[in-house]
Amino acid sequence: MMMIRAGAPVDEMIQELLPHLEPGDVIIDGGNSDFRDTERRVKEVEARGMLYVGTGISGGEIGALTGPSVMPGGSPAAWPLVKDLLQGIAAKLDDGTPCCEWIGSGGAGHYVKMVHNGIEYGDMQLIAESYFMLRKYGQLENDEIADIFAGWNKGELNSYLIGITADICRVRDTDGGYLLDRILDIAGQKGTGKWT
């Protein structure tokens, strides 16, 4: 299983791995690969007699500690071989059900991860715009905005992103000012938002 930068590094790693693999072996790509690249890789690896699983993984730091959501897709014959492994590392629902199920063939796993990221980025944009409106036009202080977000988080808008936004609105820097007021209004992205 590899979790490396998407694009050429994945292709390079596959080329390094292939001479050491036997027919029926499985390569799992757990990075944020473009689903179209995964489609191509599935075909290329299967042509060599091996199996390829493009796996979307979500959960960040908390997922690293408690288990991520795992979205595998690729060579269908690989699922019985990797199911126990992937479901074993996945987060679990209260009833023990793993947050991992076979998504489909080809690039399906990475496609679902791309859509997941696109929705998350859209949510983050809405939260950022809400903050901007409350701060600039509502003339509210960050503590007041934090109270509003915390209130929203108790109702139908309850989400991890709104909760952490409420928390960060309250954080002060070493000079006693709001940390948010020192953060530049710029952001980068890894590609999945653009692909969506």
Q: What label would you give each PLM region?
A:
Residues 9-15, 34-146, 154-178:
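Rossmann-fold dinucleotide-binding core
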Residues 1-11, 16-19:
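Active-site beta->alpha loop and helix N-cap motifs at the rims of alpha/beta catalytic domains
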Residues 177-196:
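A conserved active-site cap/scaffold subdomain adjacent to cofactor or substrate pockets
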Residues 2, 18-42:
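ADP-ribose/adenylate-binding Rossmann-like module
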Residues 24, 54, 63, 191-193:
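Glycine-centered small-residue hotspots that permit tight backbone geometry or close packing
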Residues 1-3, 26-31, 71, 114-115, ...:
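Short glycine-rich or small-residue beta-strand-to-loop segments that form or flank ligand, phosphate
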Residues 32, 121, 185-188:
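Residue-level marker of alpha-helix boundaries and capping positions
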